[in-house]
């Protein structure tokens, strides 16, 4: 069996019909040690004090959706993704994600 270990599988990989299952160990939040990321997260747009926070969360959710999409590359492709990070549930409740992603999530 093929085993691929990478710190980031959200972009740059196209392995159709090759990934039966994958593990996402951690939600890929951007590094708050980066001053630009921190400034964007803390940004308030007018009276919307949480604008930057929501953008930060939406970016992380988009990375999760992209990573999960690596396991399913075609309509007839199958793959299972296990997301282990306990921070995923609160993120899932708060952040935007596409309907097709929400329809495929099953909680264990």
Language-model features, listed with the residues they occupy:
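ASCE RecA-like P-loop NTPase motor cores
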Residues: 1-108
């Amino acid at each position: 069996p093929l085993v691929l270990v990478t710190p980031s599988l959200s972009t740059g990989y196209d392995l159709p019909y090759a990934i039966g299952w994958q593990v996402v160990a951690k939600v890929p939040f951007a590094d708050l040690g980066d001053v630009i990321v921190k400034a964007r997260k803390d940004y308030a747009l007018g009276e919307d004090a949480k604008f930057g926070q929501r953008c930060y969360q939406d970016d992380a959710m988009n990375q999760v959706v992209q990573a999960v999409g690596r396991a399913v590359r075609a309509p007839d492709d199958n793959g299972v993704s296990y997301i282990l990070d306990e921070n995923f549930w609160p993120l899932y409740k708060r952040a935007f994600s596409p309907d097709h992603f929400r329809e495929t999530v099953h909680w264990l």
